């Protein structure tokens, strides 16, 4: 494996997040918020695809089933241009119960297969948390990896299940599964820095240069100090697709490509390589 691996990932929430995770309990969807999601599909995603094509990069897109059903043409373009599509819930459900998740999974798999032509092997939880019942469902359905946790920054590891906690004793770690974890970080995500919201109030007008330095310094440290590091960036078409941010992403790509021993990969590729290098005794 080269010295540094870059994984660009895009959470293609589109309208779905404004119907669930960011609905703020409204009785009906906000037309303004819906239009923000629509921008991601109509404008942001095509800009990103054009940028990736310009630099010959194949990325990973985590697509809710709702996005695939609502915007099939752009989702088919994502697949047609060689990008990986991962599972991201159906309507960006942040905290489903086990019985709800079973239906969500079925709906999402049906929608994604229509645009991707095959079942996804990767998952990012919309609520960025993992319950044991979710892990079990992923394992039962042959998933290769998850990218929702933050237990490392530049190294892959195995997802655990069966952790136990108490306020009267130490935290007890469960057992490792065969599911590979490709860690995520809020510091390498565009949503917290740039997504304005009235309710709950989020200012989110962070200076572009400030976030660029976050992302660049993460890369520079990894490339200089970490052997075989994996840098995973999480962005959203309705955010990173804005004019002032798509140019920032291009600046970052240019900076990374100037370094020696750097490659861009899909998440499924690095997970497969990790499995080969660290085989599971009892898969």
PLM segments and residue spans:
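Active-site beta->alpha N-cap acidic-glycine motif
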Residues: 1-84, 254-255, 261
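Short, well-ordered coil/turn segments that N-cap beta-strands
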Residues: 2-6, 55-59, 80-84, 116-121, ...
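Conserved, mostly hydrophobic/aromatic
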Residues: 11, 52, 88, 123, ...
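Active-site beta-loop-alpha junctions enriched in small/polar residues
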Residues: 11-15, 64-66, 90-92, 125-128, ...
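Acidic-and-aromatic substrate-binding clefts and catalytic sites of carbohydrate-active enzymes
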Residues: 37-42, 60-72, 93-102, 124-133, ...
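Generic structural signal for well-ordered alpha-helices
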Residues: 45-49, 72-76, 102-109, 135, ...
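Active-site-adjacent pocket scaffolds in enzyme catalytic domains
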Residues: 110-114, 118-227
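C-terminal domain-boundary segment and adjacent tail
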Residues: 205-283
């Amino acid at each position: 494996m080269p010295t540094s691996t870059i994984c660009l990932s895009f959470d293609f929430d589109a309208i779905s997040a404004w119907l669930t995770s960011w609905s703020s309990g409204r009785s009906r969807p906000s037309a303004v918020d819906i239009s923000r999601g629509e921008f991601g599909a109509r404008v942001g995603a095509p800009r990103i695809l054009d940028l990736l094509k310009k630099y010959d990069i194949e990325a990973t897109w985590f697509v809710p089933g709702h996005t695939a059903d609502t915007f099939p043409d752009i989702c088919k373009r994502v697949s047609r241009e060689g990008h990986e599509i991962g599972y991201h819930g159906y309507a960006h459900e942040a905290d489903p119960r086990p019985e709800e998740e079973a239906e969500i999974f079925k709906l999402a798999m049906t929608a994604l297969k229509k645009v991707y032509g095959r079942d996804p092997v990767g998952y990012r939880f919309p609520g960025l948390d993992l319950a044991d019942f979710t892990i079990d469902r992923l394992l039962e359905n042959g998933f290769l990896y998850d990218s929702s946790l933050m237990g490392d920054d530049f190294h892959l590891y195995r997802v655990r299940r069966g952790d136990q906690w108490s306020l009267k004793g130490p935290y007890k770690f469960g057992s490792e599964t065969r599911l590979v974890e490709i860690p995520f970080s809020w510091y390498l995500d565009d949503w917290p820095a740039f997504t304005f919201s009235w309710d709950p109030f989020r200012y989110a007008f962070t200076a572009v240069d400030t976030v660029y330095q976050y992302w660049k310094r993460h890369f520079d440290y990894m490339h200089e100090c970490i052997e075989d590091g994996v840098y995973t960036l999480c962005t959203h078409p309705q955010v990173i697709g804005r004019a002032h941010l798509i140019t920032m992403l291009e600046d970052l790509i240019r900076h990374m490509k100037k370094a020696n021993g750097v490659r861009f990969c899909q998440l499924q590729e690095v997970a497969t390589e990790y499995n080969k290098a660290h085989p599971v005794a009892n898969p």
